[in-house]
């Protein structure tokens, strides 16, 4: 596809491998990502070796497709996109990870791919048998290829007899010289020689090297791959005219004893530990505030509720369940991550909110921007403006949903049904801000 060619043409480098993907609509639905032609895409490599920082995000092209020859109907429609994978000395680590960041308006989504699945078509035997190249691959020496595609400028002799015959007879200058100071070997300066300008020998014609370029017409070899995280199918395209150099796994260079100490999920574990640590600390601040006020909470949003023990017990249950759910909600799309990244960029004060679904009812809505809350808004006015937000009011008027509002200063408010609010805080260090800025921007 032309979008694959564009990504390969403008993003390929000696230290990068471009992997071309076809992502069906069902693949986006499994990640709860809207299937929209206005999606924009970015690629980043995160390394298994935790001492190596992730690469910068690279913007890539994506294009919607509705049908492609050879693809099953379940693979259509979809979006064609490419991933930029950083390698070193033609070696890749199967446990490294490349992240596809997807933006739609102000919403950010992430899809993670392990390199073991992205390099699968290049090492699987089945992918080598089914190919669309018409002519078999030939081992061609690069020097021979150059000599066969350029015109000769000197007379070459293919046998010793030709060399001896050349020594016994005089011949005009065998090659054109662009500078008269250059002379043939063995000539004596001052001895009369035929001038290059006086010779009647015609100058050799310039022969341009022509390369056949049929990148857009080449048919790719399409391989179906299972996504490790969701078990959903997607497709990798291998083009004969855009083939990647043969890469070797770093696991082939280490011993079996060393391999036993390698954690395949180290890069995931490190990120989950980071996100869990800050969610856990935030929940602790909420519990500390409740204890300091003898579990008396204030209603900041005017919502009519029943004043009885059953309502009070329900609010307490929502608080307890929210604390458990928050500690397990380790997502780079969370409101506090968006707020931390805004602080990393030194942007003006802004607000984001997470709508948390409790008791496994529904899907969380994370990192949603609240544009009506401006930089100079005070808390009293903040609650008034939120009371005009339909989605916010729908959350606090019904059971099974709570909200976490976070600003760029990392102040956070837990909003329970009925408009009751508990204020906490995310304690973020400068190192944490750099960690978020490098990965979740």
Curated annotation (Swiss-Prot):
Where found?
A: Virion; Host nucleus
- On whether NADP is a keyword of this UniProt record, the answer is no
| InterPro entries xrefs | UL17-like
- Which cellular component, as a GO term, is one annotated location? viral capsid
Q: Does the keyword Transcription regulation apply?
A: no
UniProt keyword terms in alphabetical order = Capsid protein, Host nucleus, Late protein, Viral genome packaging, Viral release from host cell, Virion
Q: Name one Pfam family in it.
A: Herpes_UL17
Q: Name one GO biological process term.
A: chromosome organization
Look up the domain of life of the source.
Answer: Viruses
Q: What does this protein do?
A: Capsid vertex-specific component that plays a role during viral DNA encapsidation, assuring correct genome cleavage and presumably stabilizing capsids that contain full-length viral genomes.
HAMAP family named in the record: HSV_CVC1 (MF_04017)
User: Into which family does the record put it?
Assistant: Belongs to the herpesviridae CVC1 protein family.
Task: Share what the entry says about its subunit structure, partners included.
Answer: Interacts (via C-terminus) with capsid vertex component 2/CVC2.
Q: What is the protein name stated in its UniProt record?
A: Capsid vertex component 1
Species name: Saimiriine herpesvirus 2 (strain 11)
